[in-house]
Structures are given as C-alpha cells and as structure tokens.
Amino acid sequence: MNSQGFVESRNIRSIEINTDVVVIGGGLTGVCCALSAARLGSKVVLVQDRPVLGGNASSEVRLWALGATSHMGNNNRWSREGGIIDEIMTENLYRNREGNPVIFDTVLLDMVMHQPGITMLLNTVVHSVGKKDKRTISHVVAHNAINETSYRISGKYFADCSGDGLVSYLAGSPYRMGSEAREDYDEGFAPDRDIYGELLGHTILFYMKDTGKPVKYVAPQFALKDVERHISKIHNDQYFSIHHHGCKYWWIEYGGRLDTIHDSEDIKRELWKVVYGIWDYIKNSGKFPEMANYTLEWVGTIPGKRESRRMVGLYTLNQRDIIERHTHYDAVAYGGWAIDLHPSNGVYASGRACNQWHSKGVYQIPYRCYLGDHIDNLMFGGRIISTTHVANGSTRVMCTSACGGQVIGTALALCNRYDCKPADFVDPDRIKVLQRELLSWGHYIPGLELKDDSDLLNTAEVKASSVYLFDGYRHNGRFAPLKFSTAALFPVEAGKMPAISLNVKASEPTVLVVELRHAVCGNGYTPDGLIEKKRYELKEGDNEIKIEFETEIPRRQYIFVCFMANDKVMMPQSNDLITGTTTVLNQINLAVSNYGRQDPPAGIGIESFEFWCPLRRPESKNIAFRLSPALHIFSPEFMKNGVMRPEGGTNAWAASNEDSDPSLTLSWPTEQTISELRLFFDTDFDHAMETVQMGHSESVMPYCVRDYRVTDGEGKVLARVEGNYKSVNRLKFNPPAVTGKLSIHLRKPSQEVPATLFHVMVK
C-alpha cells in the first residue's frame, strides 16, 4: 500500500534521456526515419503524440498510404517507393491484404518495437525546445498525460517529422504557411488566394457496416441540417454514394480558410457536424431505404491534416521542378503523385473537390529540401519539407513523405557516425556517400545507380544457368474486347524492331490500327512520340496478323505497341507475368482525375498528354503475341548496373522457363571472406499497395521469388529461405563464409513467372 499525507505541492515524475537521434513524430515519415537511423547504429528516441504509430495512415484517421503509383492511375510505371516504406507496404500486404487499419497499426508497432536501438514514447507530446546556442538544439521537453511523466530528451541530432513542424517552429526556423504568388517561382498553377484559397483543409472519415437488422439513428443536435442545401456534392455521384465509406469520403474537408494549426479543434468539430449530418441524411431522409440495416461503425476522433507550416530549406521545390522533372545533383527521394490542390472552402465549395494535374513521370527531390540554414543539428521531413504550396500538393502524400523519412534518418545516422553536420552532405562529393547508403537498402532515387567500391560483386565473374529470352506472351485461350486502346509495353535495344505476330478475332470486317510509340522525354512511360503507324484489314472471325515495323530504334528504351480501340476486335490474352514488361490501357481512373488524357487550361504551366495505365490483377492480362527474333532484355550482367527496378530496361536477370534449377553463380580468382549477402527481388513496383480499405487480390506479389538457397564453392548450403515475400533479403553469415564462389539457386514463382533477380550485393 502507498499512502501519503498532505504536502503543499507535488511535481509529476521527470525522466531524462540522452540519445543520438531524437525523432519527433510517429507517422510513416517518423517511423522510416527512426528505423533507418537505428539500423545504422544510432540510438534513437521516437516521440509520438498519439497512442499508435502511423499518423494519417493509422487506425485513428484511416487514410490509405499512397505515393508515386497514384492508385495506378498515372504514367509512372514501376514507381512504388522502395526502402523501408516498401518493407512496410509488403509486410502489410502479407499480413493484411484486406486493408484492416487496426492490423496496419500492428505492422508499424512490430517493426519499431523489434528494432534494437529505438526507444518509443507514445502519447508523448513535445511542448518546448532547449538550445545549446543560437544554431544548436540541445533537448526537447515532452509530457505524457497517461503515465504522468515529463521527459527531457537530449540528443545530438533532431528530426522534425511532427506534421506541423513544431520543433522547427519552436527552435526559430523560418517557415511559410499558405500560397506563394505566381511570380515568386514562376508557378502558373499557383491559386488565386481570395477565390480558391491557399491552404488545404482537414478531413474526418467514417466507416459503416450492415448489422443484418434495422438500426435507427438519432442524430446529435450538432449534426448539420439540410445537407442537400449546404453540400452540393451530395448531388454528384462522383463524390457521394451510399455505398461509399472511409477514404471515399476524402472530400469531407474543412479548414482551408482557417489556421490549420491553432484552429484544429474548431475544424474537427465542424467536420463532425458534417459527418453526422451526412449520416443523418443517409439514414433519415427517406431516400435510401436500403440503408435501414446499416449503422455507423467508426467516426474519426482526430482529423487528418493535409497542410500547415512548410519549413524554408536550402532549396524550395516548386511546380517547375515537378512538371519539367528537373535533375538535382543531390537527389535523394522522389515523388509522383499529381499536383493536387483543393479549394479552401472544402466540403462547402461548389465545383470540383480537387484539381489534380499530373507530370509525365516521377520527379527528383533534392537533399536541400530537408534542412535549413539556421539550425545545424535539425532536419525536417514529411509534409513540412521546403516546397511551395503548389509543389506541396504532390510531395505531401504519405509514401513520398516516408521516402524522405528514410533520407533524414540515414543522413543523421551518418552524421553521428562521422561526427559531422547535416549541411556537410550538401557537398557534391559527400552527397554521394548518402545516396550510396540509401540505394544499398533498396531505396530508389530516379536516375541514380548504386556504385559501391566495397561490394565484392564488382570483381566477381557472374554467370547464369540460363537466360530468359523475351519472345512475347503465351496465349491462355481467352480473348477480350478492344474497348480501350491497349499497348504492350516492353524494352528494346538499339536496332530493328522485332516482328510481332498475334491472332485477333473480329465480329465483322473492320480495320485494326497499330501504332509504335515511345516516350519523347527519355526514360518515362508517356507514349507521346509516334514512331510508326500500321493498318490491318480484318475479316470476320480469326485473323493471324504479322506486324513488321520499318523503323530502326536508335537507343535502349521502352516502346509501346499500341492497338487502337475498336470494339469489333477481340484481343488474345495471356497469364504470363514477365518482369519489366506489362500491358497498359488508355482508359479512365476518376480517383486521380485521369480522364484518359490531361488537357489543362492554357497558361498554368502543365502539359497535355494521354494516360496509359495497367489494370489491377486479377482483371489485368497481357496481350498474347510472339516476337521474332526474341529480345535479349535480361542478363546476369545487369546484376552490376546498380538499378533495382525497371528503368530504361528490365535491369534484371531472369532464367529460362525450362530451367529446372535456375541459378546465378559469382566467382572470384581467389577466396573471399563474405559476411553479408543482399538480394533484391521483384515485388512488382507497379502495384499500388494501398494500406487500408481497398484490399488486394494477393498477399504476395506473383513476380517475387519465394524460395531459394545460397551455396559456396563446395556446395555447402550457407542459407536457405522459404516463403520470401520481401523486395530486399539481407543474409548475414556468422562466421563469415570463406569461398571463391557463391551460387544462388532460385525456384521460379509459378509456371507463368520466371525466376528473376534485380541485384546482388556481397560484403
């Protein structure tokens, strides 16, 4: 028993913690930051003000995490984020393909709790910052009301992943809030501040469920009345449907005309008013009798935020960087979501709930956007990085932010290792150290190759048991109507295009138009360049056609063989799935403002182009055709090019389908001491792994090698893995293997998918 008498006053418990890296904010950005820093040997304290990790992706808000893939509704092929956020997404898919937000919470908690070197403080709110001097943060002070504890957390380095930039703000860093003028950064899409507004608002979502019996609903007094008059989108089936819930109600947005930090409680109450009012309309207007058995299962208790402070960094990313896809010497991350701005009146605005304009491909984000010029031991990540309001419309999404989290966690861990400042990596030579470290963990930076002098692969002779020759896709016996223009997308080397043969059906005599296209901008996937056009007269029934193009292809690149829409034509289908090749369609995806093509108003600095996007499995099928001669688009030599996904080519080795024991052998003239092997597999970087609600048809990507073993020169098994589903496998040998040869034996995933590998690292 603990019994205490009266005293004049008491203080709550106080704990002091000293660490290397302090990460403030436990959203996806903060989680990736903390994990990356800890894996590189730094002691980390992760301070999160909520009871769970994940931020807007958590069960408290329930927004799906997305990034460059944009629901697979843009031209960013193979663009899903790599590195730690890829680990999170593939783990969630494996455990939780149905998209339960509560399960996603556990995925994040598991990863952080089982990572040595991280101290996690949940329900802990930072409220003040201490400084050693004008340019150096010494500590933060935080309070946990649940355990009545005050924490004084001292660190060498600080990462502000708080969403609102609280630590940067308290430390005195410069920031912006709202929109720049058009002339400030030559941004044609910068909004009219008075008419459109200059801040994005908050959102609260809700879930419903069918109880199987009638459920009445009595709305709270604060619920919005006369919803049809106040919310025009109720009359627009693109937005409102009684079958929608969760993320489909992203347009329930409010607060863009207010202070999205200090007015957040008022904004939340207004959003509750709207949510409960909409549910009252659904249940009690008498217009939807089919909803009699439905009840509210969940309503968000905190709003999901889109925008508040943006810190001023050494570089400010802007609209032109995104649309023109500028190259930066210090590129460390990338984006690909559309520039997505919302009217500040939010749910009460008339007209569209958002204005999305896409770039033709992914764009680089420079390191200089993650640090400022005033605090030497501070970096910032997430939606608060140094961008304009317009650029923030793209960079703010969670998977893009998470990429940046890994960047700043890695940078601060390297600072800790080398006893330097984050600004030191702005140097053109030093930035290569950071870029190399990021790439070695599977992090993707468009246009960069991993070059590591310490990698024993550099001096190895690489041989394969066989090599897959791409000669097209086998027919599965089924046909599908050519309702939309459809293209086979695959890479070719310089030289003459191979002939393409296929069997198509026609319901009546008609003409099939075939266009050979490519991306004018280089290594993109927007087929805006017409190379050659063919026309084929089809008779009713079966037609065997052979397409022979005259054009010489000048360089290694991706090409599109486009079969233009004709509803009288049936195209042959295939179940084959071959890495770095796919089938794309010129169709509509309203979820990301994809109407088949993009035609922006004149003068806003956005390009017009068509969208050619894949379908999702299981609906997605490749076009069955035969190539002659077959293409040599896979090679064991690609193991050395340092690119771990399709970019300009497959960048992969794939074994022949007839190979009963696909293997890759690395040989050295003398014995090597090998302590670590990293293998980089194909987990279909084209598939958007939305974390919640949508659900997926697979828990493991069908391209991924599940089972493999590694042997030395004597045939001794050094490692055996069964049931793999991850992109990067890191194998540690203790004691180290001493051998002059390593063989990696893969089992092909299925009869439709050859065994494939992107890259090998040997340490």
Segment roles from a protein language model:
Residues 2, 8-10, 18, 36, ...:
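Conserved N-terminal/central alpha/beta ligand/cofactor-binding core
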Residues 15-27:
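Beta1/beta-strand and adjacent pyrophosphate-binding region of the FAD-binding site
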Residues 475-491, 544-545, 651-670:
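Short beta-strands within extracellular/lumenal beta-sheet-rich domains
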